[in-house]
C-alpha cells in the first residue's frame, strides 16, 4: 500500500473524529472522537516518518500515545464523577462549575 493511501486514511479518520466532536453532545462519544483524532495524527506522523526514512515521527507518535493513555485515565475519571453526580453523560448537563 502506498504512503498516499495512509495519508488519505489519516485525513478521513481525523475528519470523522472532528465531526464527532462537533456534532455529538455525549461526553464519552466526544472523548472517543478526540482519541480518534489523536490516532489519525499518529498515523500521519508514522507515514511521514516512513516516507522520509527517519524515526522522528515514530518517536513523536509513541510519546503521543503515552500522553493519550494518561488523558484517557484522567478523562474517564472526570466523566465518571460527572455521571455519578448528574446521572447524565451529556456535555450540556455538566455545569458543575456554577455550584
From Swiss-Prot:
Catalyzed reactions: a quinone + NADH + 5 H(+)(in) = a quinol + NAD(+) + 4 H(+)(out)
GO cellular component term of the entry, any: plasma membrane
GO BP field: ATP synthesis coupled electron transport
Pfam family, one: Oxidored_q2
Enzyme class: translocase
Entry function: NDH-1 shuttles electrons from NADH, via FMN and iron-sulfur (Fe-S) centers, to quinones in the respiratory chain. The immediate electron acceptor for the enzyme in this species is believed to be a menaquinone. Couples the redox reaction to proton translocation (for every two electrons transferred, four hydrogen ions are translocated across the cytoplasmic membrane), and thus conserves the redox energy in a proton gradient.
Family indicated by similarity: Belongs to the complex I subunit 4L family.
NCBIfam families: PRK05715.1-2
Self-association state and partner proteins as the record states: NDH-1 is composed of 14 different subunits. Subunits NuoA, H, J, K, L, M, N constitute the membrane sector of the complex.
Name this polypeptide is given: NADH-quinone oxidoreductase subunit K
Gene, per the UniProt record: nuoK
Amino acid at each position: 500500500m502506498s504512503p498516499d493511501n495512509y495519508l488519505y486514511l489519516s485525513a478521513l479518520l481525523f475528519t470523522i473524529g472532528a465531526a464527532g466532536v462537533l456534532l455529538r453532545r455525549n461526553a464519552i462519544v466526544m472523548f472517543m472522537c478526540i482519541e480518534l483524532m489523536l490516532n489519525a495524527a499518529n498515523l500521519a506522523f508514522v507515514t511521514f516518518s516512513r516516507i522520509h526514512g527517519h524515526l522522528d515521527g515514530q518517536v513523536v507518535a509513541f510519546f503521543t500515545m503515552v500522553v493519550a493513555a494518561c488523558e484517557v485515565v484522567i478523562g474517564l475519571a472526570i466523566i465518571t464523577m460527572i455521571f455519578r453526580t448528574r446521572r447524565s453523560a451529556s456535555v450540556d448537563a455538566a455545569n458543575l462549575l456554577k455550584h
